Amino acid sequence: MLVKTTHFGEINIKDEDIIEFSEGIVGFEDIHRYGIIRNQNSDSPFSWLQAVEKSELAFAVVDPFVIKKDYDFVLSDEYVKALDINDPSQVNVYAIVVVPDDLTKISMNLKAPVIVNKDNRKAAQVILDTDEYTVRHYIMDELQKQEV
């Protein structure tokens, strides 16, 4: 699918990389279809969610398990059913990233991960019922902990 974007110009997103949020993303509930744009650097855990219907809307995302090794949560039965998940191997998890001017403050939202069933391309942003994670988990702090 050819998609015109503000950030990447005109790009071709494969059909298998188009995902659908039945309820949208928090704050953007009216936008349902996004394309996953993977980083050209295969070692990078970062990707983009580009709105198909809104050229200027794109979210930087990251595989949270690469950054926070002990990230763990239980997906409610409601979402397992809504996304038709039968096996954990069907799932990709992304955290939305905020990239401020001060890159030392780059953060990811661990409180509301994006869950994608990669088999049927259904997706949902899930707000976790826990105080263990925040919407602003600092990536550089987490990486520094791993170096110690």
UniProtKB/Swiss-Prot annotation:
One of its GO terms (biological process) is bacterial-type flagellum assembly. One of its GO terms (cellular component) is cytoplasm. Keywords: Bacterial flagellum biogenesis, Chaperone, Cytoplasm, Translation regulation. It holds the Pfam family FliW. InterPro entries: Flagellar_assembly_factor_FliW, Flagellar_assmbl_FliW_dom_sf. It is found in: Cytoplasm. Belongs to the FliW family. Interacts with translational regulator CsrA and flagellin(s). Acts as an anti-CsrA protein, binds CsrA and prevents it from repressing translation of its target genes, one of which is flagellin. Binds to flagellin and participates in the assembly of the flagellum. NCBIfam families: PRK13285.1-1, PRK13285.2-1. This is Flagellar assembly factor FliW. The lineage of its organism: Bacteria, Bacillati, Bacillota, Clostridia, Eubacteriales.
